[in-house]
UniProtKB/Swiss-Prot annotation:
Name assigned to this protein: Type 4 adapter protein LvgA
GO terms classed as biological process: protein transport
Function noted in UniProt: Component of the Dot/Icm type IVB secretion system (T4BSS), which is used to inject bacterial effector proteins into eukaryotic host cells. Part of a subcomplex which recruits effector proteins and delivers them to the core transmembrane subcomplex. Is a critical subunit for binding a subset of effector proteins. Recognizes more than one type of binding motif. May be a critical factor that confers host specificity.
Conditions for induction: Constitutively expressed in vitro.
Gene null: resulting phenotype: Mutant is differentially attenuated in diverse hosts. Inactivation of the gene causes a minimal defect in growth in the human monocytic cell line U937 and the environmental host A.castellanii, but mutant is severely attenuated for intracellular growth in mouse macrophages. Mutant appears to assemble a fully functional Dot/Icm complex and exhibits wild-type levels of contact-dependent cytotoxicity.
GO CC terms in record: cytoplasm
Main location: cytoplasm
Transmembrane segments: none
Subunit organization: The T4BSS is a complex nanomachine composed of several subcomplexes. This subunit is part of the Type IV Coupling Complex (T4CC), a subcomplex composed of the DotLMNYZ core and the IcmSW-LvgA adapter subunits, linked by the C-terminal tail of DotL. Interacts with DotL, IcmS and IcmW. Interacts with various effector proteins, including VpdB, SetA, PieA and SidH.
Location within or outside the cell: Cytoplasm
Taxonomic placement: Bacteria, Pseudomonadati, Pseudomonadota, Gammaproteobacteria, Legionellales
Length: 208
């Protein structure tokens, strides 16, 4: 009986492997499935880039790597990824955590908030007034660009994103903002926001 059981189980294994092979072949021949898989991979190491078009900002070569800083009054570091600072361009990505962060965008969103803070400090140090038009451009993962746009439109500065069309998502976002405000929850806080400087407890570190 034991030998028979082994043969039956082996048959199930062979059938399962055959089914997997057929599924894999079908996926390889399906352009939509390939695009979906590529998008999923990109989501795991999503990148984001912020370019300052106007006013002119000198390029830094080689780029400076801004690492997470120690939060004052604690032993924790900022909950952000490394930022590559090229002067007129700021870049980051989830690549260092791509296997542990999964599809979570929390840490990337916090990093984007820090990038917006760096942008504002750069405008201040350059003597740019809040009324002067500042032109920037985005690159990277679509969801990261949406987060950056949400932060930018809540700045006191006159910052214009030249290459991002919020489209239907933007309309829904504004509708949700108004709906929450009408219910008494208020409007989103003004940017830049230093939420990345709050210590992240051990129970929430998985949100990378």
């Amino acid at each position: 009986m034991a030998d028979g059981d082994i043969e039956i189980k082996a048959g199930f294994v062979d059938t399962d492997l055959d089914d997997r092979k057929l599924t894999m072949i079908d996926d390889l021949n399906n352009p939509l499935a390939i695009v979906e898989r590529v998008y999923l991979i990109w989501w795991h190491w999503a990148d984001f880039h912020l370019h300052v078009i106007s006013p002119h900002i000198d390029t830094i070569t080689p780029a400076i790597v801004i690492e997470p800083e120690l939060i004052p009054g604690s032993n924790d570091h900022e909950f952000v990824y490394s930022i590559h600072d090229s002067g007129s361009k700021l870049s980051t990505s989830k690549s260092q955590d791509m296997f542990s962060a999964g599809m979570s965008m929390c840490k990337l969103f916090y990093t984007i908030e820090k990038m917006v803070y760096i942008l504002v400090e750069r405008l201040k140090s350059g003597g740019v007034s809040m009324e002067a038009e500042v032109q920037i451009a985005f690159a990277g993962h679509e969801i990261a660009q949406r987060k950056a746009f949400e932060s930018i439109i809540n700045l006191p500065y006159n910052v214009v994103v030249t290459n991002f069309d919020p489209g239907i998502w933007g309309e829904k976002y504004l509708q949700n903002v108004k709906r929450l405000a009408d219910k008494g929850y208020g409007y989103p806080p003004e940017s830049p926001r230093k939420i990345y400087m709050h210590p992240v407890s051990s129970g929430t570190t998985a949100r990378k």
